[in-house]
Amino acid sequence: MRILTICGIGDIHWVMLKMESFIEKECKGVIPEITVWNFDGRPRADGFVSRIPFVKFAGYDNEPMGRQQKRLFHEMYMEGFKDVVSGFKGYDYFICVNGSLRIGHSMETIMRQYSTNWNYKINTEDCISPYSEPYIIFYFSNHGMFTDWVAKMPPEKIRSFMQQIKGYKLILTGSSWDSPFNQELEDNGVINLCGKTSLTELFGLIKGASAFVGWCGGNTIVSQHLNTPTLMLWSNYFSHRAFQTNWVDPDRLGKVYIPMDVETANNDSLMKNLGVLLGK
């Protein structure tokens, strides 16, 4: 069984919430091969898929999008017209639930014939933090759609917030393409690890962190799944507010995961919600 997914870690995580039930009903007990469509030229999901025990990573499909492929991608990624397509690009299935989540559908109603496992297994036993003292990790970027986030919460506002946090090491994380922006956030001993960690090292940092604060990305999406307190910052770039919570285990809402809008966030509200997650 060959399954194609899109390329982001968060995108794949949302599919995996349904995958065990999908395998049981459609794959007849055979472990499916997951190929990641690397249409944006930023391969970053192999280390994630390889950690999921009920699937096998089969590599990347590096073919760019053609016109007809873009049309279907838009329907699945943006509009939620489809979640599962058979035979696309020669694969048994192409699965993408982003569009349905984006327009406000709940995970329980997406691919409703398959149950949701909010606690599916990600193998992270070898992911160990190098820090013994308390620390908080952060994810900020000005890449792609995140220019909208930065317009509402620019570097000086981020630095002002981080300066309010006492008693924790502050660690910036992200990919190599996030590094130039995060250099603007280095202040008062802040540690910048953007582009300097493998996925194994990042997962170790996430597991050992007192909290993770930052934009809505694959890293913060997986953070709450690993039960690290996660303060996720959203923008009205996404019109449906349900998208902030419709993919999260209801038992984690308000306890492990709190969403906020960058448009209205200030130091007081950020510190209040961070305090809730830290148990203060």
Feature locations, PLM:
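Catalytic machinery of carbohydrate-active enzymes
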Residues: 1-280
